[in-house]
Structure formats: C-alpha cells, structure tokens
Amino acid sequence: MKKLLSTCAALSILLTFTACDNSSNSNSSSNKKSSSGKTTLNIWAFTDEVPGMIDKYMELHPDFAKKYECNTTIIATTDGAYQPALDQALAAGGKDAPDIYCAEAAFVLKYTQGDAAKYAASYSDLGIDVENEIKAADIAQYSVDIGTNPDGDVVGLGYQATGGAFIYRRSIAKDVFGTDDPAKIKEIVGPGWDKFFDAADKLADKGYGIVSGDGDIWHAVENSSDSGWIVDNKLVIDPLREEFLDLSMKLKENNYHNDTEDWKDAWFADMKGEGDKEIFGFFGPAWLINYTIAPNCGGEKVGEGTYGDWAVCEPPIGFFWGGTWLLANKDSDNKEAIGEIIDWITLNCTEDGLQYMWANGTYNESGTKDAVASGTVMEMSDGSLDFLGGQNMFDVFIPANQFANGKNLTQYDETINKYWRDQVRQYTSGQKSRKEAIDAFKQNVADNLDVTVK
C-alpha cells in the first residue's frame, strides 16, 4: 500500500482525466468510443496503484490495448473525499460511470455488502470461473469473505496479502532474548497478549519499548475480534475491542512504548531507531515493510540506519490490516474486457500474471517484492529481502493470511474506529475515566450514524 496522493494532487488528476469529455450522462451505460475509435473504460481509484497495474496489462496485451483505453479518476481518501465522489458517479450511471472501481478495507463492505453493494457485478458475470480460480490461486478466505455480497456472489477480490506479522529489530532481539530467530521470537512474543507483555517487561528492563504506540496493536485487536461494530443495526463493543482500553493503558503505565500516534513523525522516527527509546517492533502486513518502514529506516542498504536489521514472525494473535478490493459495475457494457483485467490482477497465478511479477519484484523498476493474494504464487516465489536480513517473508505471510478473519468488518469501520481510538487515547492520557471514554464513544456513534446505541 503506497502513500496516498495529496487531495490537491488527486483532484488535479481528476480534472485532467475527466475534462476531455463533457458529454451529458444518460440513464444507462453505453459503449463509449473515443476519438481514437477505442472503447473507453472508466477506472476509479484512490491511489495510482491499480491504474498503474492496468497500464501494465495494456502494455503486455497490445491486442487488448488496440481496442480499449482508460479514463482514470484518482481521488485520495484524505478527508473522506473518495467515497462521496464514487457514490455519486455510481448512482448517476451513464457513459461516465465507473467500469472498474477500488475500495479499501476501511470501507470496502459498503461496496460489497452494504449500501452501495447494488452497483457491483458478480465476478462470474465478468466471465471469471470464480470458484475454481479462487481454489487454484489459494486466495485467503478472509479476502473472499469480504468480497462476497449478501447473495453469496463474489463481487470483489484483492491483489495484496494483508495478513499481519510481528516485524521486529534483530539487534534488539539478540540483546534481550539472545536470538533473532523468527521461530524462537514468535514463541517469546506469543501466542496471546500475556506472553507479549512478558516480553515487553524484559525489553523494558533493558531500556527498550516493545512497540511505538498503542496504534501498533490496534489492528491486531480490531481484526481478531469475534464481532464487528454493528450487528443487526446495533452498536456492539466486542470484548476483545473493549480490552484495547486495558492493553493501551498497560502499555502507557509501564512505559512499554513511546506513546506515538501512527502516521505521525514520532512513529516514523522509531523506525530508524531515533525515538525517545529504541523500539522492538511493529505489527503489520508486507506493505508496511515495503512502503512505510523501509522508506523511514534511515538507509537504503545494509549498515545504513536500521536497514537489514529487521525480521518477521507470527504475531501474538492473527489479524489483517488494509488491502484494496477491485469491483466492477454491473451496468457496464464492457464486462468481458474488465473481467480480463480483474482476473489478471487478482486471480492469475501464472508467471504472466500481475501476482507473480509483484511477488518476485519484476513488476516495476524498483524491484520491490510484495506479499500477494495468491498463496499459490507465494509458494512458487522467492520472498527473500535484504531489508529482512535475507529472510523469506513469504514463509510467514502465507500462514498469516489463513489466521486473518474477514467476518468482523462493517461499512462504518473507518468512522467508528476513529471515534474509538480517540476515546482510548483520552482514557490513557488521564483526560477521561474508562466509563467516560466508553460513554463518549457511544454518544459519538449515536450522534453521527443511523444505528441503535444502548
């Protein structure tokens, strides 16, 4: 997952790509021929990642590119700009309606199972042999569950493997535990939070923090819970999510972290070992390694900053974090064409597919290897990274996908998670009591969402 484009840049792209066609919308989709005589496919995304993949598909399939071209709209999720614009485009329909559109984990259920699910085409309607291809590619069940609509049809799949691992510093592991072996470290930090905090205590004795901030454990807590925030249109606080209050307070009271907030400067500083105290690890998928920790480690080769001083092991509890699902418009007149693109990105497990190229670092010039949705592809690929001291990360991320749970999400997660984490921080900072924080959280949900709160 790459950093999002800024809102201004994204809106600039939006204007650039859509200004060329000022024709009015019709009520139904129709074939869209450009001045070149090619059929136009409308692509909607919140970063340039998926549009770049489609460009690659066009490059590798010149016969396809002779017939089709893309009109791309990119709007960053910053300040919640993407969803309203996408919703309006889907509802308006017509020749400017999205043919392919993207949704990330924080709001994907709205488009696969929630209010906007009515717009999504089933993958089978795109000419994809869904059941057999999912099985052949060994797609993790959580990804399938999230992309399945209430009728049981798959309408979205991801291309990333976003099952989570514990990503830790080898030098600190050796100093405190006498080993940096992932097979041994996973037994030290887990399974379960009790062992994790035992490890935190040993790290603290030597002046280290186990994580940078409480946000580092949040995604493990959130995605390992049994229930989502909303059940039968009623707010539910799963006991495992409520326990986040206690886990966060334990981190704070025992000085087990640097009390940072994720995606802020102090959090990034801990990745290069320049925080108030050195931090042992972070929780995350492969994208956190490639696109967040590596760029902020203070170096570009072994010996610089913390580059090469990292490893991954199974986390104390299984979870996933993030991911992008590809969907198609059920009213598109170009289902066969968009089905070919989506299949190549999400399910093709041959050496000619996106998944294989991405897993093996041959997709682009950067040579970045990433964990992909297909377990089959990762099994046949080499995930060794110098950044991880030569470790093959796929040995950890393949099973990590199987531990993830995709049945505890709701279409309101992006909003409710923010309310919850804000109140947890107010509790751990002493601004509110535990009860006051929970009550304020419930009030925020009641005031802003059309759900029942007791």
What is the predicted function of each stretch?
Residues 356-426, 454:
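Long, aromatic- and glycine/proline-rich binding clefts that accommodate carbohydrate-like moieties
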Residues 66-68, 91-94, 299-369, 422, ...:
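Extracytoplasmic/periplasmic substrate-recognition and gating elements
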Residues 5-11, 15-116, 132, 349, ...:
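Conserved N-terminal structural module of periplasmic/extracytoplasmic solute-binding proteins
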Residues 42-45, 73-75, 99-103, 156-159, ...:
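Structural recognition of the beta-strand scaffold that forms the well-ordered cores
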Residues 83-97, 113-114, 173, 197-202, ...:
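Short helices/loops that flank or line small-molecule/ion binding pockets
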Residues 51-59, 108-110, 217, 223-224, ...:
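Extracytoplasmic/periplasmic substrate-binding proteins
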Residues 124, 131-134, 144-217, 229-262, ...:
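Helix-loop-helix "hinge/cap" segment bordering the ligand-binding cleft or interdomain interface
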